[in-house]
Structure formats: structure tokens, C-alpha cells
Swiss-Prot record:
Localization in the cell: Cytoplasm
GO cellular component terms, semicolon-separated: cytosol
EC number in record: 6.1.1.7
Naturally occurring in which organism (per UniProt): Mycolicibacterium smegmatis (strain ATCC 700084 / mc(2)155)
GO molecular function: alanine-tRNA ligase activity; aminoacyl-tRNA deacylase activity; ATP binding; tRNA binding; zinc ion binding
Protein name listed in UniProt: Alanine--tRNA ligase
């Protein structure tokens, strides 16, 4: 049975049973705790928690899922995949354990001709949570399973959660016995290679808190209602129904393996275990990478981008180790498109962009391998020379940080060289780097990942946002928090702004979201203790429902239950709306100029400024930048009306509304329309009323922020005027200094630059001529140190390393065939101290090496150097040590 048929039968079965088919969500959701969607139930979490009312009591979906913690196990075992399709059925307060077991058993065991999968009931097993006697009874009653094919297991195996705070509950798993050829008897408890899990039925009834493992977390209490969340692995079922040993042999992954085998010198399944692992890595990772890129991620060095980059680079490395020298990424991505496109049409419609990003990463990493391999070879050689057998963590970190080498590549190359790697040292340096990168952001933002302190307020209901209609609102303080702990009162006592939060029942303040930073303003009130005032410095959402106002209490005290006035700074809001609407305008202009593949990858807008990231390979031309700026400002000048309305998500998409990749949208969405067809986006931010209110948009520049991602920055409104005024003043100053009209400044500057280049070239020629004359005198004055003729001189200032190399060659040629060493050092430009050492063949026969001597030469000038036996060079920063360097060199030669 082909995979597409397995998918169809699953959905048909549950639709007939009264379930609504729900499309797969993106693998990226706006949840800071979740790198990728890793379960079918993730998009339904608000329904399980009771935060939102589900539009249906029963639902079914086949969700794209990604799990990467076991990435190093992929290919080694045949059970691990980074991407999988999770087929699920969900009940929101409707049926519970009996219904879940009945529906699953019917689909699995019904004959194929009746729409089922036709599994032999005698080969199916079930596991349940330790004390779930009810589930055991139902398996015996509904399915007729004998007690010996039902096993009890603990928290680690049969109590399910996402691994983070959220819904959880005991589970019951269904296993298929593949037969004695796959291992010993004894059920799943004894052997999970023989007994393979195909379906997990989760009885979602509790909410969990923070924890450190599958077994160590707090149960916060019951959910508002009992729910069902099940997950059937499409790939595993396909493996069984297609009669193959593992998922890599199925109709979705085998085509990728065959594509690689067509160009690799060694085939798949030829008896080489390591090669088979590499084939599986390529098949698994290519599919995952294509899905991630399709959902809007580009390779990067953090978070999801880092995972994608690692996947792509593991593909490339595995292909290289199979002996494939030609580029393969384009063919692999096309194979995934052909195999999975019928189920995931975005792989077809967005193929050009997906392919472009993957191929660009392949090209970049091939360069990385070429340059980094030299550094690895040097480090390995130095390690062996020192008598050690362990490559340092520092070297491994440099390979990773500077050249992008994944640690597993370094490990493999080290093993081939007969070395191991200090992995602990590497991990320490990596941890320090990540800590440094995140320290500032962590200090500024409190992530609200632990909701236990806010639970009562979250359960009481959401904050009412009034900011679309007014900038000032009367409100009641629902809660006061200091350092995340609830307190009844807070007063002006020097508490830092980020430590105090006020939760209101209603607010006009926009909470940071969608790239728009939070409003600023004040909260004030008059209570029993007098007048109180607080400056609002930030506003963040808690559980997407509560607005937490981070404040600096400037006077008086605030008491829970007080009535207060929340007032947004109108100047701030005006600037924020200009920035946000300007972002939409620039986005529309980008797509008009570059085409539909210029997809948003992120944004930031604040009063007077916007930053827009988009997926694009290579820098924009000057003409493209000018066009984008012109299209944007033409739309501003057109004074388009900005219209907002709320509609159903599917209707908005049908209208062509742009949605941000990875964002999770509710069923009812807000649409922002600027100028009819010019710009139409899903957006919950604040905006101007017409485009002319944005004011001029001035693009400051365009740059790269990662592989395949570009960034445009711009000023809007008054800040744009100020920027233009500065540029005008700068041009006027240049014109005055050059004594030409403004319009002649570019030509005048170009002329001056050419004259300067000519003068510098002539100066270099004269300096080198003088140096060559000095070289003749240097040969005549060569000293004898032991058996070696030595020319060691301090040259006149301004000499470059290239100049010194040229002179060294002249001098060495004039010293003849007897043992000779030439060492020149100079005071170069920008406080640099370049130096070069040359050793002729006769001196090398005496044991002298330029790459050894240059180290003695470098130390006194605080420099570094390296090279080969005949020629080495370097540079330092301490001109005061030049004489000492010359003396050290003489002494070293004298000891030889």
C-alpha cells in the first residue's frame, strides 16, 4: 500500500466518524519554547488548555513533524527520522478512552477492502500507564487483546507531554510484532526492534509544569475537560504495509537513496555498514531540509536556521564520504519534490526558492570544506608533533566557529588521522559563546516560560485590548508582580523597570508582537495612598492572553484592584504606526520589484525606523534598491486608504493575504489592506489611516544577515526628513571644501581618488627603488654568524610585507650559494611591524628553517608568523621591539 493511500484511508476513516479534517500546520510556530512542531497536537494546545473554544468537538489531521535531538542516531538505527508525518485524531471533551481505542483498532484491523489497513490482530500488542486499569479493561473488551499482550510501563514510556509546560496525560501505545527474525519474544518491554510502535493514544487530562526529564515534572492539575490526542506514524505504518525492513526502503525515501546511488561509486546495501548509514542520512535529511525551507527557514547560526544548516551540511558531507564529487543538492531536492509534492504542494509551488537556498548552502559548504581542511591538517600535524593524541577543544571550536565545521565532521576527520577530540573542551567553548550571545537579550526580556505564577489570571480571562480605538483607557489592576512573584502592592522604592509588572483588565498599550515593539506611555491613578504614576517601558504577552506592562514606578504606590488610567504616548504610537505601515509598503515593493520569491523572513519596526528581512540569494543591485524605494514612495504619495477588517483565515488566504511563515493564526484573523491590491497582509499591529501619513521612506542600506536572507533598513516620517537633511548638509560641506557645485562633487571626488592612487603608486615605486639601493649595501655589509652569512636589517618606515618579500628575494640571490639567512623588518603603516625571513638551501642543510626562525623574530614585537622552511613572514604591533627582534634572531642562529 503506497503512502498516499495510507494517508487517504486514515483521513477518510475519521471523517466518516464525525471528525473535521484540519490541514497540517507549519512546522514553525511562534512559541519560544518549541523549536519545531514535534507532535500532531501542537496546533490544538489552546483548545486542550481551555484558552480557546474549539470550532469542532472532533478533528483529524496529518501533521508535519520534526524532531532533531537524536540527529546523530539517524541512519545508524532504522527507527530514527528527523521528519515524520503524524496522523492523529482529536477529541475535545467528546469521546475519551473507549472511543479512542475503538476507532484505532477498527482502522488497523479492518480488511483492506473495507477501508482498513488489514493488520493481523494476533500480531498487535498494547502498553498502558502503570495504574491505568481502565485502559487494560477496554483493550480486553473492545479489541479482545489477551492480558499477556498488554504491558504496563512507567512515566518515561507511557505518560506523554511535549517536553515543556502544557497539556499531558497517560497514554496507551499500539505495537506490531514483526516476528522472531527481528529479535526475542517478550513484547515491547523486551525488544522495540521486533515490536515496533505504530500508534500512541494519549488520554489528555492534565497540565504539567517545568521539569528536567520525561519523569521529572510537576502535574499542575486537571485540564478543563478530558481530551483525546493520538498519533500514528505514517512512515512506520508504510514500512509494515509495504513489507520492507525499514522506513528508508519505503516509497518516500527510497527514491532519494536511488538518486545518490546513481552517481556514487559505492552502492546502497552492498555490505558496507558505514556507507549505508550515509545513504540514510542523505535520504532523511534531504526530506527534512526541504520541508523546513518550504516553511520559511533559511540556513543560519542560531535556532532553526542552525538546525537547517547542520542538516544540509551533513547531507553534503555524507555524499563526499560516499565518493560523490559533483554537486547533488539540486537533484536531491527535486526527488523529494516528486515523492512528496502530492501531499505537500508547497514543495512544488515553491520549488525554485527551496532549491536555490539548498544549492547555495551546498556551494558555500564546499568552499568551507576546502579552506577548513587545511586548518584541520595543520592542527592535526601540530598535535602529533607534540606527542599528543587528542585534538584540542580550542582547535575544534575554531573549525566550527570560523569555518562552519560541524563537530561530527571534526570527529570523523580526527579519527581518520588517528586522533580523538577534546569534546568536553569544545562543548565548554560552545556554551560560553552561546551564553555571551544570549546574555544581553536574556537580561532585557523575561520570557514568561513558567506560567505558574500567572495561572490564576490566565484562567480568569484575557486582557481586553482597546488600542485600535483609543490611546487612553480606564482599567483595573488585576495583578502586580515583582521579579515574577505576585504582590498586593508596589511603591516607588527604586525598583528597576524590568522588575515590576502590572496586569490590567483592559489596555490601549500594544504588546510586542509581529515585529512591532511595544508602546510606551504611563499608567497613573489616585488611590487611598494618593497619586501614583508609572512609566511603561515594555509590554509583553503572557500565554498570548494577558498583557504584562513592565513599568518604572515614579511616584506613589499601586494596589491590586486600583482603578488606573493607562495612556499611550501619542507621539510614540504615531511613529510606531508609521514604521509598521512602512514595513508593509516595503514588503509590497520588494515583491513587485523582485517577484513572489522575496518572502518575508522577519521584521522589526519602531517609531521612525523599520527593518525587513526577506529570503533572497545575493545582494540587490543599486538599480533594484532604487526601484524598491521609488515604488514604496509612489505608494505613499498615492495616499492609499489603510483598511483593516476581521475575517476567517481561509477566506483571507483565498483573497491573497500574505501570512508570515511560521506564525500561528487563529480561525478569525485581522487583515490589513493598503491600496486594495497593493498590500494585503494578515497583521495584528497598529497602522496609519492612509499611506501619506507614513511620510517619505528612505532606504538606508541592504545587507546579508545569513545564508539566503537579506535585510533592508529604512527611515520613515520625520526621521526620514532628518536623515535626508544630514545627507544634504554633508553634500554641501563636501562641495564647499572642494570648491565645486554640489552636482559636480562625484566627478571631483573621482578625479581626486585617481590622482591619489597615481601618487601612491609613484611613492611606492620610489620607496622600493630606495630600498633596493639599500639592499646592495646590505649584501656588502653582511655579517658572519657561525657558518652563516646573515643580513638582518631594519628597513625604513612605510614598507609592506610585499615590499619586504621582494627585497628578501633580491638580497638572497646576491649572497651566492654559501649558507645564508636574510631577515628584514620594518615599521609599516597603521602601526604594523611586518617582517620576513628567508633561508637558502645551504643554510637549510645546517638545520636552519625560516618557519622556526620567524617565531624568534616575532616574539619581541608582539607578533605572529609562519611559513615554510625557505620563506616565512609575519607581523607585529610593537615597533619598540624591533632591535630586540634582530638581536634574538642573531642569537638563535649563533646557537645553531
Amino acid at each position: 500500500m503506497q503512502t498516499h493511500e495510507i494517508r487517504k484511508r486514515f483521513l477518510d476513516h475519521f471523517v466518516k466518524a464525525g471528525h473535521t479534517e484540519v490541514p497540517s500546520a507549519s512546522v514553525i510556530l511562534d512559541d519560544p519554547n518549541l523549536l519545531f512542531v514535534n507532535a500532531g497536537m501542537v496546533q490544538f494546545v489552546p483548545y486542550f488548555l481551555g484558552q480557546r473554544t474549539p470550532p469542532w468537538n472532533r478533528a483529524t489531521s496529518i501533521q508535519k513533524c520534526i524532531r532533531t535531538p537524536d540527529i546523530d542516531e539517524v541512519g545508524i538505527t532504522t527507527r530514527h527520522n528527523t521528519f515524520f508525518q503524524m496522523a492523529g485524531n482529536f477529541s475535545f471533551g467528546d469521546y475519551f478512552k473507549r472511543g479512542a481505542i475503538e476507532l484505532a483498532w477498527t482502522l488497523l484491523t479492518n480488511p483492506v477492502e473495507e477501508g482498513g489497513y488489514g493488520f493481523d490482530p494476533e500480531r498487535l500488542w498494547a502498553t498502558v500507564y502503570l495504574d491505568d486499569d481502565e485502559a487494560i479493561g477496554l483493550w480486553q473488551e473492545v479489541a479482545g487483546l489477551p492480558a499477556e499482550r498488554i504491558q504496563r510501563r512507567g512515566m518515561a514510556d507511557n505518560y506523554w507531554s511535549m517536553g515543556i509546560p502544557g497539556p499531558c496525560g497517560p497514554s496507551s501505545e499500539i505495537y506490531y510484532d514483526r516476528g522472531p527474525e527481528y529479535g526475542v519474544e517478550g513484547g515491547p518491554e523486551a525488544n522495540e526492534d521486533r515490536y515496533i510502535e505504530i500508534w500512541n493514544l494519549v488520554f489528555m487530562q492534565n497540565e504539567r509544569g517545568e521539569g528536567t526529564s520525561k519523569e521529572d515534572f510537576e502535574i499542575l492539575g486537571p485540564l478543563p475537560r478530558k481530551n483525546i490526542d493520538t498519533g500514528m506514524g505514517i512512515e512506520r505504518v508504510a514500512c509494515l504495509l509495504q513489507g520492507v525492513d525499514n522506513v528508508y526502503e519505503t516509497d518516500l525515501l527510497r527514491p532519494v537513496i536511488d538518486k545518490v546511488a546513481a552517481v556514487a561509486p559505492r552502492g546502497y546495501g552492498a555490505g558496507n555498514h558505514d556507507d549505508d548509514v550515509r545513504y540514510r542520512i542523505i535520504a532523511d535529511h534531504t526530506r527534512t531540509a526541504a520541508i523546513i525551507i518550504a516553511d520559511g527557514v533559511s540556513p543560519g547560526n542560531e535556532g532553526r536556521g542552525y538546525v537547517l544548516r547542520r542538516l544540509l551540511r551533513r547531507i553534503i558531507r555524507a555524499a563526499k564520504l560516499l565518493g560523490v564529487e559533483q554537486p547533488v543538492m539540486g537533484d536531491l531536492i527535486a526527488t523529494v519534490r516528486d515523492a512528496m509534492g502530492p501531499s505537500y504542494p508547497e514543495l512544488v509551488t515553491d520549488f525554485e526558492r527551496i532549491n536555490r537556498i539548498a544549492v547555495a548552502e551546498e556551494t558555500a559548504f564546499n568552499r568551507t570544506l576546502a579552506s577548513g581542511s587545511k586548518l584541520f591538517e595543520d592542527a592535526a600535524r601540530a598535535t602529533k608533533k607534540s606527542g599528543a593524541t587528542v585534538l584540542s577543544g580550542s582547535d575544534a571550536f575554531t573549525l566550527h566557529d570560523t569555518y562552519g565545521f560541524p563537530i561530527d565532521l571534526t570527529l570523523e576527520m580526527a579519527a581518520e588521522a588517528g586522533l580523538s577530540v577534546d569534546q568536553e573542551g569544545f562543548r565548554t567553548l560552545m556554551a560560553e559563546q552561546r551564553q555571551r550571545a544570549k546574555a544581553d537579550a536574556a537580561a532585557r526580556k523575561q520570557a514568561h516560560t513558567d506560567l505558574s505564577a500567572y495561572r490564576e489570571l490566565v484562567d480568569a480571562g484575557p486582557t481586553e485590548f482597546t488600542g485600535f480605538d483609543e490611546l487612553t483607557s480606564e482599567a483595573t489592576i488585576l495583578g502586580i508582580f515583582v521579579d515574577g512573584k505576585r504582590v498586593p502592592v508596589v511603591s516607588h522604592d527604586g525598583l528597576e523597570a524590568d522588575r515590576v509588572e502590572l496586569i490590567l483588565d483592559r489596555t490601549p498599550f500594544y504588546a510586542e508582537a509581529g515585529g512591532q515593539i511595544a508602546d510606551e506611555g504611563t499608567i497613573s491613578g489616585t488611590g487611598a495612598s494618593g497619586t501614583a504614576r508609572a512609566a511603561v517601558t515594555d509590554v509583553q504577552k503572557i500565554a498570548r492572553t494577558l498583557w504584562a506592562h513592565r513599568v518604572n514606578v515614579e511616584s506613589g504606590e499601586f494596589v491590586e484592584g486600583d482603578t488606573v488610567t493607562a495612556a499611550v504616548d501619542p507621539k510614540w504610537r504615531r511613529g510606531a504606526t508609521q514604521g509598521h505601515s512602512g514595513t508593509h509598503m516595503v514588503h509590497a515593493a520588494l515583491r513587485e520589484v523582485l517577484g513572489p520569491n522575496a518572502v518575508q523572513a522577519g521584521s522589526l519596526n519602531r517609531p521612525g525606523y523599520l527593518r525587513f528581512d526577506f529570503n533572497w540569494q545575493g545582494p540587490l543591485s543599486d538599480d533594484q534598491r532604487t526601484q524598491i524605494e521609488e515604488v514604496t514612495n509612489q505608494a505613499v504619495e498615492a495616499d492609499y486608504e489603510v483598511h483593516t477588517f476581521v475575517t476567517e483565515l481561509e477566506k483571507a488566504k483565498a483573497m491573497g493575504a500574505m501570512a508570515m511563515f511560521g506564525e500561528r493564526y487563529p480561525d478569525q484573523v485581522r487583515v490589513v489592506e493598503i491600496g486594495g491590491p497593493f498590500s494585503l497582509e494578515l497583521c495584528g499591529g497598529t497602522h496609519v489611516h492612509n499611506s501619506a501619513q507614513i511620510g517619505p521612506v528612505t532606504i538606508l542600506g541592504e545587507s546579508s544577515v545569513g545564508s539566503g536572507v537579506r535585510r533592508v533598513e529604512a527611515y520613515v516620517g520625520l526621521d526620514s526628513f532628518r536623515h535626508l537633511a544630514k545627507e544634504r548638509a554633508l553634500m554641501a560641506g563636501l562641495a564647499s571644501s572642494l570648491k565645486v557645485p554640489s552636482e559636480e562633487v562625484p566627478a571631483r571626488v573621482a578625479n581626486l581618488v585617481e590622482r591619489l592612487k597615481a601618487a601612491e603608486k609613484e611613492l611606492d615605486r620610489m620607496r622600493l627603488a630606495n630600498a633596493r639601493a639599500a639592499a646592495v649595501n646590505a649584501v656588502a655589509g653582511a655579517e658572519t654568524v657561525g657558518k652563516v652569512r646573515l643580513v638582518a636589517q631594519r628597513m625604513s618606515g612605510g614598507m609592506s610585507a610585499n615590499d619586504l618579500r621582494s627585497l628578501v628575494g633580491d638580497i638572497r640571490g646576491k649572497l651566492g650559494s654559501e649558507p645564508a639567512v636574510v631577515a628584514l623588518i620594518a615599521e609599516g603603516e597603521n602601526d604594523a611591524v611586518p617582517f620576513v625571513v628567508a633561508v637558502n638551501p645551504a643554510a637549510q642543510d645546517l638545520g636552519l628553517r625560516a618557519n622556526d626562525l620567524v617565531k624568534q623574530f616575532a616574539a619581541p614585537v608582539n607578533g605572529r608568523g609562519g611559513g615554510k622552511a625557505d620563506l616565512a613572514q609575519g607581523s607585529g604591533k610593537g615597533a619598540a621591539g624591533i632591535d630586540a627582534a634582530l638581536a634574538a634572531l642573531r642569537a638563535e642562529i649563533g646557537r645553531s
